């Protein structure tokens, strides 16, 4: 006979079920069938999440449950593990006498060798495969200014993805960019990066609010001796372009012919527009909106504020007819690219209904898209992409920056050019098309490990073509090196888990997170 005390997992299952039954009696929400959903366990891979969300919930409620679940799980998991990253040696300790070589007195030879030739720092230290993830946390996802340490979760997450997907070591550096007046000063970030660049192979800028982000990136790209990459802007642009390439193939339209509406004019969308135009789109056939309306040459507020020079550049080349409203702009538009604010219901179904046949809709606000995919489809969208992995067609930086940074590091590039970003987009699109694409699967997923070395090799070759590489190699050499580093990173992580050095997440943490999410939605 079963007794709860003798079976922990079944005890947890019984407790969750009992709580749910009580809740059902009180609120008359959970049916008998729904109780069976709660009784089942979430897999550690989380791949059965949708099966455990009650069928009686609407699509909107189900989407909210998923969002709330991942937020609750994130909080519990980060607290359980005390963050996501740690430092481990890459060299052996065969005995304590080895510290005489790894440290003093032997390490003196390393110091003088690098002093005499700074380039040897890439061979004699871990610098060549190390990226600083730098942020002042002034625009963290859709949560705004989170104070300097508030960005640590995202920055550590970026470093986590770099390592696991790209075989690149990353370190989170959240800095305080506020001056004596309390205002965020971009020069503080610029000075910090320029002073610390000699410890890294590349810099990844993250979650810096506009307009400061424009100055920080543009100055550092020119004044640093290592690549400086703004992932919110350049990374988003790269992956969006990759998705757009394949979406256009599926609807048999050409980039140079389509009408594009950009909803949101922050760093991400402004850079997307610039990169998409560089890839062949006609800027005169595009219209961009910020929170004050459409961009065009009549926007004196943008022209007069020199901090927004990137937006003013777009005012001069887009929307020649000075269309003022989204309703008018969306008439016969082929593509909508929205990166504005978290939804849903930020993008209206009525707008999508005005679009051309076989319309393409990218709604990439995080953590909730401007309109849910099902609603966009109901309004007539043919292809819908979001920034989330739990919906079809995830257009997320995670498929781009690990390979791009790896490619730049492999050839010791001095910068990442726009051509390198476009090469990455083309590589992602080509890889995705080769393995097969359709309207619900336009771009490779981060689980497809082969895309990253493929992308890295193409980026490395473009760096050589652009004359910014310090190291020459063939495409195959770059591919093999990236693939081996990625394999080693994944194998190391697996070994740490298999041998108990990284504890597996407790089943209770998963089940309770889902229970909390469902209760928050159902009341």
Which ranges hold each PLM region?
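Adenosine-phosphate binding glycine-rich loop
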Residues: 231-232, 251, 360-473, 496, ...
């Amino acid at each position: 006979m079963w007794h709860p005390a003798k079976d922990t997992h079944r005890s947890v299952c019984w407790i969750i079920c009992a709580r749910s039954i009580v809740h059902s009696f009180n609120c008359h929400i959970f049916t008998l069938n729904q109780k069976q959903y709660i009784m089942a366990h979430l897999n550690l891979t989380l791949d059965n999440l949708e099966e455990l969300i009650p069928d009686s919930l609407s699509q909107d409620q189900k989407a909210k449950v998923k969002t709330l679940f991942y937020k609750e799980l994130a909080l519990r998991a980060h607290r359980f593990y005390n963050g996501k990253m740690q430092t481990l040696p890459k060299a052996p300790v065969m005995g304590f006498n080895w510290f005489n070589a790894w440290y003093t007195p032997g390490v003196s030879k390393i110091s003088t060798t690098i002093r005499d030739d700074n380039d040897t720092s890439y061979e004699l230290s871990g610098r060549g495969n190390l990226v600083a993830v730098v942020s002042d946390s002034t625009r963290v996802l859709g949560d705004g200014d989170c104070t300097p340490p508030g960005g640590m979760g995202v920055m550590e997450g970026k470093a986590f993805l770099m390592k696991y997907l790209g075989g690149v070591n990353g370190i989170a550096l959240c800095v305080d960019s506020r001056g004596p007046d309390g205002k965020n000063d971009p020069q503080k970030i610029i000075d910090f990066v320029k002073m610390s660049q000699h410890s890294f192979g590349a810099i990844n800028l993250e979650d810096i609010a506009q307009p400061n982000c424009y100055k920080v990136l543009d100055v550092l790209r020119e004044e640093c001796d290592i690549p400086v990459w703004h992932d919110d802007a350049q990374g988003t642009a790269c992956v969006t372009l990759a998705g757009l390439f394949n979406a256009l193939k599926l609807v048999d339209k050409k980039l140079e012919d389509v009408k594009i509406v950009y909803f949101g004019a922050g760093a991400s969308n402004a850079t997307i527009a610039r990169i998409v135009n560089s890839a062949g789109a006609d800027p005169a056939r595009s219209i961009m909106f910020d929170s004050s309306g459409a961009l065009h040459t009549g926007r004196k507020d943008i022209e007069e504020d020199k901090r927004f020079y990137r937006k003013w550049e777009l005012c001069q080349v887009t929307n020649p007819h000075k269309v003022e409203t989204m309703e008018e702009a969306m008439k016969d538009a082929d593509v909508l690219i929205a990166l504005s604010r978290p939804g849903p219901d930020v993008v209206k179904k009525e707008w999508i209904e005005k679009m051309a046949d076989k319309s393409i809709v990218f709604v990439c606000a995080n953590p909730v898209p401007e309109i849910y995919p099902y609603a966009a489809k109901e309004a007539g969208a043919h292809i819908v992409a979001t920034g989330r992995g739990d919906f079809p067609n995830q257009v997320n930086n995670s498929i781009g920056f690990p390979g791009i940074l790896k490619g730049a590091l492999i050839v010791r590039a001095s910068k990442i050019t726009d051509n390198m970003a476009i090469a990455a987009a083309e590589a992602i699109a080509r890889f995705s098309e080769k393995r097969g694409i359709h309207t619900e699967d336009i771009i490779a997923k981060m689980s497809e490990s082969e895309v990253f070395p493929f992308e890295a090799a193409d980026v490395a070759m473009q760096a050589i073509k652009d004359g910014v590489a310090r190291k020459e190699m063939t495409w195959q050499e770059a591919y093999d090196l990236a693939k081996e580093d990625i394999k080693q990173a994944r194998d190391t992580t697996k070994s740490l888990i298999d041998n108990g050095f990284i504890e597996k997440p407790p089943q209770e943490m998963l089940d309770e997170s889902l229970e909390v999410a469902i209760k928050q939605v159902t009341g």
